[in-house]
A protein has these predicted regions:
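Extracellular glycan-targeting catalytic surfaces
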Residues: 1-198, 204-211, 286, 539, ...
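Acidic, mature catalytic/reactive cores of soluble proteins
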Residues: 68, 73-77, 90-93, 100-104, ...
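Active-site-adjacent structural elements in folded domains
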Residues: 84-86, 143-147, 173, 189-198, ...
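Inter-helical turn/loop segments and adjacent helix faces that build the functional surface
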Residues: 109, 167-178, 217-221, 268-277
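Alpha-helical cores of eukaryotic small-GTPase signaling modules
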Residues: 209-236
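Carbohydrate-active enzyme catalytic cores, enriched for enzymes
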Residues: 211, 217, 253-415, 610-611, ...
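Long, repeat-rich segments with strong aromatic
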Residues: 230-269, 506, 521
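CBM-like, beta-strand-rich accessory domains located in the C-terminal region of large
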Residues: 423-427, 431-668
């Protein structure tokens, strides 16, 4: 066995608790309690088809009902494709996971049933795998054999290979030869053929699987391909890591998804000459996202992030990396993970230190990362936070939301980033992945074309913080060394320039926006608030004028020709939330409701509409508990704006210079 030495295995056996063993059995009860079932052909497709189109929630499945798929919200049954193929993908995943988990259990408990199940699964796949038809058709993805995409092939094969390593000693030479030739080598060769020449989390997974198979089979050709070729592991780390340590795709989920692949390789390779721990971006990438934990305890749902993936639950990564490279950050994140759950788990058993130090949990912190393009401002006393996304374009998993905004008040998301749902659900491409469902500028209700923003200024002192950035579509379009599908409209954004500065005061955030719109397109400054609109007698009901993702918006109302107004919202469990707005020329305001995430509830939208060649706005987001802020005395000049903020009889006056993007506080 390559994964653990005999001495390590003895120590693991001695430390294993019955609850750990029971947890492993429970996680694999479907395979343990049913006859082994392996598809005879390549009928499996894609697990992300397994979502209800309307609610965007994952369907429920049963091992004995491969043709019946149930929505957990309303009990509706779905049959046929794409759900049947997704069910078989689920089963392939269960089988592969069982190979690893039950193979490990056999090493710990020596119970024959675990060995027999793993042996049968591996031999059955070895029977069929060479003859599985290549099939695919998944957006952005290469094909598979057992499944419909190359990524899924890699995910299954890494568990099949590690499971084989656990039981190899108990197999006959003929069985070993069959599994190695007809399953593991067939899989590695297929993955090598279909690895794409791109930076991508998929390629990290594919490389890791090829490398693990190479380590287990002692095949240096596989190892070298995985590590050292163009688009291999080191290439991905060297070119896919942005300056401060963020994975270029801009999603915290896919950042750790790429690292999960890397660590699956490193857990076997760390004591060999093939360890990747000497790559300087390895630890940078492990540490950087920990700076993005918001004051609700979660990561922001930037870009593609399915509900639930924002949670900090990465024991499988940090147990290992803390033991290999102990430091305060990794001790802190393990404190977070184990705040509400026991450490009596398999990752701590296999890879963790015997006892963790007493460490403070990771907390939200103010952070400015110019190259990653993320700025967080945090007021600890009031538990408020703000995130401005001025990140470069990230490719497939991007959400076309440059200069997007997130606001949290007292630990609760007020202006959230919704993330997304399963990619097979209509709501993914039809709603969540669109510019118009983010707190940013939308032109003609079309998606922003790829652009890399420019940071204009970052100004911080004891009284306030200012961050200013610009997305200018007159500049060269953004490019990324990763496959993309065109899901944007270049013509809509041609020559448009959007400048957004945020003045952070701790209990308020003030937006200073400029939109340059030379071709006089219809544009919207869009805000969605996790709350409900309070009544406003000025609003009148209208037929929804919006196209695209917000065509589904309901209860649409309009206030016309405004230069100053206030939007008020009721927030569950908190006081009201107010937005005070001023513009240098008249705008219309459209309000309504569209899906939150999950789509079982709605979120309140406010769209500030104009088609003027230029618009300047000031927007005060009142994050105070008593909602006592007022926006007053806004004076527009050609290159600057002055405004006053009144709170509890205290007035503060500011001047923002749009020529140099500096802000100063004036004496009243």
């Amino acid at each position: 066995m390559l994964q653990f030495s005999s001495q390590q295995m003895v120590a693991i056996k001695n430390k294993a608790t019955q609850s750990m063993i029971d947890a492993q059995k429970n996680d694999n009860e479907v395979v343990l309690n049913n006859p082994v079932l392996v598809p005879e052909d390549g009928r499996a497709t894609w697990n992300l088809y397994y979502f209800f189109p309307e609610h965007g929630v994952r369907l429920t499945s049963a091992r004995d009902q491969p043709l019946s798929h149930i929505c957990p919200v309303d009990g509706k049954e779905f049959t046929g494709e794409p759900y049947d193929g997704a069910w078989w993908r689920w089963l392939n995943g269960l089988n592969a996971k069982a190979c690893y988990d039950l193979g490990l259990l056999w090493q710990i408990t020596e119970e024959p049933i675990h060995l027999e199940i793993v042996r049968e699964i591996l031999l059955e796949y070895a029977n069929y795998y060479p003859n599985y038809e290549v099939h695919g058709g998944i957006p952005y993805n290469g094909p598979g054999k057992a499944n419909a995409q190359t990524l899924c092939e890699a995910n299954c094969h890494i568990d099949l290979a590690r499971g084989y390593d656990f039981i190899k000693q108990a197999l006959t030479e003929q069985e070993q030869d069959k599994i190695e030739k007809r399953l593991l080598r067939e899989g590695a060769e297929f993955l090598m053929e279909h690895r794409s020449a791109q930076l991508h989390n998929h390629e990290m997974k594919i490389n890791a699987t090829i490398g693990v198979i190479g380590l287990i089979l002692d095949d240096h050709r596989y190892i070298d391909f995985a590590l050292n070729t163009d688009y291999g592991i080191h290439y991905q780390l060297n070119h896919g890591c942005l300056g401060e340590g963020m994975w270029f795709e801009g999603s915290v989920h896919y950042h750790y998804y790429a690292l999960q692949a890397l660590l699956n390789f490193e857990k076997i390779a760390h004591s060999t000459p093939y360890s990747v721990s000497n790559n300087p971006n390895y630890l940078k990438m492990m540490k950087f996202p920990l700076k993005l934990v918001m004051n609700n305890g979660d990561f922001p749902r930037l870009n593609d992030s399915i509900a639930g993936q924002e949670k900090l639950t990465h024991a499988h990564l940090f147990e290992f990396v803390y033991k290999q490279t102990p430091c305060e950050e990794f001790a802190q994140v393990l404190t977070n993970i184990y705040q509400n759950i026991s450490r009596d788990n398999i990752d701590a058993l296999l890879y963790g230190v015997d006892e963790l130090p007493n460490a403070e949990p990771i907390k939200c912190q103010s952070m400015h990362a110019e190259q990653a393009g993320l700025t967080i401002c945090y007021d600890e006393a009031r538990n408020n936070s703000m995130l401005l996304k001025h990140a470069p374009y990230g490719g497939e998993h991007d959400h076309y939301d440059r200069l997007g905004l997130i606001l949290n008040r007292n630990g609760k998301e007020i202006l959230p980033d919704l993330g997304t749902t399963g990619y097979g659900a209509e709501l993914h491409y039809g709603y969540y992945k669109n510019t118009s469902t983010h707190n940013t500028l939308v032109v003609n209700q079309q998606n922003q074309s790829p652009i890399n923003p420019t940071l204009l200024n970052y100004q911080q002192n004891e009284k306030f913080t200012l961050v200013a950035s610009e997305a200018n579509w007159a500049n060269k379009p953004a490019e990324v060394d990763s496959h993309t599908l065109v899901q944007w409209n270049e013509e809509a954004y041609r020559d448009v320039c959007f400048r957004r500065a945020i003045l952070w005061l701790g209990d308020a955030a003030v937006e200073l926006n400029t939109v340059i719109n030379p071709h006089q397109q219809q544009f919207d400054l869009t805000y969605h608030v996790r709350g409900t609109h309070l009544a406003n007698e000025q609003r009148k009901s209208i037929v929804n004028p919006l196209s695209g993702a917000l065509e589904r918006m309901r209860d649409v109302q309009l206030i016309e020709s405004q230069t100053e107004f206030t939007q008020c919202y009721a927030i569950e469990g908190q006081p009201e939330f107010n937005q005070h707005f001023a513009a240098d020329r008249e705008v219309d305001v459209v309000t309504g409701y569209a899906p939150d995430n999950p789509a079982t509830s709605d979120i309140a939208y406010s769209l500030v509409r104009s088609n003027q060649p230029e618009l300047k706005t000031v927007l005060l987001h009142d994050l105070s508990e008593k909602q006592t802020y007022q926006l007053q005395k806004v004076i527009w000049c050609e290159k600057q704006v002055e405004f006053s903020l009144l709170k509890s009889n205290l007035t503060r006056r500011f001047r923002y210079n749009q020529a140099n993007n500096q802000i100063s506080e004036l004496a009243e």
